[in-house]
Amino acid sequence: ASLAQITKNAIALEDVFGFDVVESLRAANSLTDQFGISAEEAFNLIVQGAQKGLNQNDDLLDTINEYSVQFRNAGYSADDMFNMLANGAETGTWSIDKLGDAVKEFNIRMSDGTANEYLEQLGLNTEEVIAQFNKGGPEAQAAIGDIMEALQECDDATLQYQAGVGLFGTMWEDLGVDTVASLMDTQGAIQSTSDAMAQLDSAAYDTLESS
């Protein structure tokens, strides 16, 4: 996309959602840098995120800027990230900054060895799970899936709580098992290949023309 088109997109986001133009450009840039997608795809995702209500607390663009690297490091795509945030938010957590923070805390604990004892307590093969997580991409996602399954199926409430906090930090206390499980679900309708931005552009342009 040309610079003119990118700027036009950012202005349309300002008109429709009240997003600051510079912040929109920065968020789109974060997405292209971290996930290797095009500017057009980045704007498609931002539009769909806003349409899903992810900016209820005015923290969508900040969350993209701050946490894209964390989702990428955990093996997720840009599409995954937006669907995860939408799924987490649907459980009633509209402060999506907290959802991003949960992924960040999890990454740190998986990387620095803090997670090991909790993975063991959940009955997982720690070495295997960590090695799989460190491969990134689908391998990492599969490892995370195993961890979430073990957490959800844990009948011992005390152990579940300890392991949850051990893996996700204080975000586990803030969010709870259902929200974290939803957050770790990548299924959803948000796609970078949609034409959400083009549709918004034409609608915003029509409005400007007629006003």
Indicate where each model-derived feature is located.
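Short hydrophobic/aromatic segments of transmembrane alpha-helices and their interfaces
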Residues: 4-5, 123
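Solvent-exposed, membrane-proximal periplasmic/extracellular interface segments of envelope transport
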Residues: 1-3, 136
